[in-house]
């Protein structure tokens, strides 16, 4: 079996002054390469928290998360960051585009960090596929919400990652662009 991701009894709790808030409770999940999975639930049900855990941006209270058969819950932040940089693309609900970088620069940065050839050209080709050819040199503040979302998606998939985590990936897109993505 080509297991890409495995969660075993993953729990996430937050402690406030008065309460313990259980966000995720004994989550078990196994995915294979090329699987497409949707996690659906009410607002506040833990979907974003699950993405943050899988992406190594937050630590589980307990349980294990394996990515490509490696227990990422036992790794240092730097080691998890390296895995994320090379193998995981994340589309956040808030796009987190770099405000003083153009659309091309926001996408090319991922490619540059991974020392790929022609990052600017690759970024332009990807953005062109997403209908943003006339927006290459625009800053995020000069883009609509839907355009920013397409830049964020292009950035997440630029490295052709093994795993793409997307939090409401088409939330700001019209129906035509949702289908295109």
Annotated model-derived regions:
Residues 4-5, 10-181:
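ABC family nucleotide-binding domain
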